[in-house]
Amino acid sequence: MDARIKHLNSRIDRLEAEFERNRQQLLHLADENRRGTSDYDALLERNLHINDEIQSLLNAIWKLEEQQQHQ
C-alpha cells in the first residue's frame, strides 16, 4: 500500500476515534442536561408552592392583626 494512502487511512482512523469520543460526550451532556432540567423544574415548582404558602400565611397574619385592631 502506498505510504500516502496509509497516512490518509491513519488520519481517518484518528478522526473516527475522535468522532466517537465526541459522540459519547455529547450523549453524556444531553443526559446531564435532561437531569438538570428536571431538577430545575422540580425546584421551581417547589418554590412556587412555598411562595403560595408564605402568601397564605401572611394573609392569615394580616387578617388576625386587623381583627385585633378592631377589638
What is each of the regions a protein language model found here?
Residues 21, 27-69:
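Short, charge-rich amphipathic interface segments used for partner binding and complex assembly
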Residues 1-20, 45:
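Short, charge/polar-rich alpha-helical segments
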